Regions:
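A short, flexible loop at the N-terminus of ABC-type nucleotide-binding domains that lies
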Residues: 1-21, 27
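Helix-to-loop junction immediately C-terminal to a conserved catalytic motif
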Residues: 49
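ABC transporter nucleotide-binding domain
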Residues: 167-182, 186-247
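ABC-family P-loop ATPase nucleotide-binding domains
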Residues: 79-137
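Conserved ABC transporter NBD signature motif
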Residues: 57-68, 72-73
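Catalytic Walker B motif of ABC-type/P-loop ATPase nucleotide-binding domains
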Residues: 150-154
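The feature captures the beta-strand-to-loop junction immediately N-terminal to the Walker
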Residues: 34-36
C-alpha cells in the first residue's frame, strides 16, 4: 500500500533528514512510528500525504505518486498533524465544509466518536475550545472519513488519561483489512495494546520494522532473575520496581512487549538487536 524505495529527503543541502530509506506499510495493521524528536517521523508522514516531496528515490501510495497530489489519492488519505490549524467554525460547520472531500465520510460515525469523547454539542465554536477538545474533534473526524490511509502525528497530545483510553478503543474499532493506520508518537506508553506493527527510527534510518508477534517471539522482556543465566542480555534498565531486561528469547518464552524498554534498547544497542532479527529471518 505504501512503499518507500531509496528515499532521500532534506530541508537543507547540508543535512539529510532521511537517507536511502526503504520501508513498507501494509493495510490491515495499526503501525506505531517511534523515534526521538528530530528523527523525521512527521516528515515521513508528510511525504506519504503529498505535503512534502522526496529529492531522490521512489515513493508509491496506493499505486499513486504522492507528489502529483491526485484527487483520487487525496480523498483516501487523512493526515492529522501535531499542530492543529486554527478554525473559527462550529463543529457542525466544520463537518459541512470538510466532509465532502472524503466520499466515504460517515456522519453517524463522527457523531458516535464525539459522543465517546464526551463532546455534547456540534454548536461549539472550535476556537473557543481547549487544545484537548480540539484534538478530540479532529481525531473523531479523521476516524469518520473512513479513508484507506489514516496518518496521525502525536494524536494523544493534549488528551487526559480517560480520553487516551477512549482514543485507543476507537482507533482499534476503526481498523479493517483494507485500512492502514500509522500513528507517530514519542509517548510510547500510549500505544500499548493498540499497535500490531512497530517501526522505530534512529539516526534518520529505520532501526526496526517488525510485527509485535515477531518481536515477542525473538526478544524476551523480563525482570532480572539472579538465578537465570540462560538468556543473553541485550539491555538492562534500573527502576524502582527492579531491573528490567531485554534478552534474546532463546527458549521461546512468552512475555509482554514493553515498548518503552524496547525503544531504549534499540537506541543503546541497535546493531545487536538488528542482528537477532536479520539472522533469524535468514534462517527461515
Amino acid at each position: 500500500m505504501i512503499h518507500f524505495e531509496k528515499i532521500d529527503f532534506s530541508y537543507s543541502s547540508k543535512v539529510k533528514l532521511l537517507s536511502d530509506m526503504n520501508l513498507q506499510f501494509e493495510p490491515g495493521h495499526i503501525h506505531g512510528l517511534l523515534g526521538k524528536n528530530g528523527e523525521g517521523k512527521s516528515t515521513l508522514l508528510k511525504l506519504i500525504a503529498g505535503l512534502l516531496f522526496p529529492q531522490k528515490g521512489k515513493l508509491e501510495v496506493m499505486n499513486f505518486t504522492p507528489a502529483k497530489r491526485m484527487p483520487e489519492m487525496l480523498r483516501d488519505i487523512y493526515f492529522l498533524p501535531e499542530e492543529l490549524p486554527h478554525h473559527t467554525l462550529s463543529i457542525a460547520r466544520f463537518q459541512q465544509v470538510y466532509a465532502p472531500f472524503y466520499p466515504k465520510f460517515s456522519a453517524e460515525l463522527f457523531d458516535d466518536c464525539l459522543t465517546e469523547f464526551e463532546i455534547p454539542s456540534k454548536d461549539w465554536k472550535m476556537d473557543k475550545l481547549s487544545y484537548g477538545q480540539k484534538k478530540k474533534i479532529i481525531v473523531a473526524f479523521g476516524l469518520a472519513t473512513r479513508t484507506k490511509i489514516l496518518l496521525m502525528d502525536e494524536p494523544t497530545n493534549g488528551l487526559d488519561i480517560p480520553s487516551k483510553g477512549q482514543f485507543r478503543r476507537m482507533v482499534a474499532s476503526a481498523l479493517d483489512e483494507n485500512r492502514c493506520i500509522i500513528i507517530s508518537t514519542h509517548q510510547v506508553r500510549d500505544l500499548d495494546s493498540l499497535i500490531d506493527n512497530l517501526v522505530i527510527m534512529d539516526n534518520h534510518c529505520i532501526a526496526l520494522n517488525e510485527t509485535i508477534e515477531t518481536i515477542t517471539d525473538r526478544l524476551l522482556f523480563r525482570v532480572q532473575d539472579a538465578d537465570r543465566k540462560d538468556a543473553p542480555i541485550i539491555y538492562s534498565e534500573n527502576t524502582l520496581r527492579g531491573v528490567f531486561q531485554v534478552c534474546e528469547n532463546v527458549n521461546g518464552e512468552d512475555s509482554k512487549l514493553d515498548i518503552e524498554l524496547l525503544f531504549n534498547a534499540i537506541i543503546a544497542n541497535k546493531k545487536q538487536i538488528q542482528k537477532i532479527f536479520n539472522h533469524q529471518t535468514e534462517k527461515k
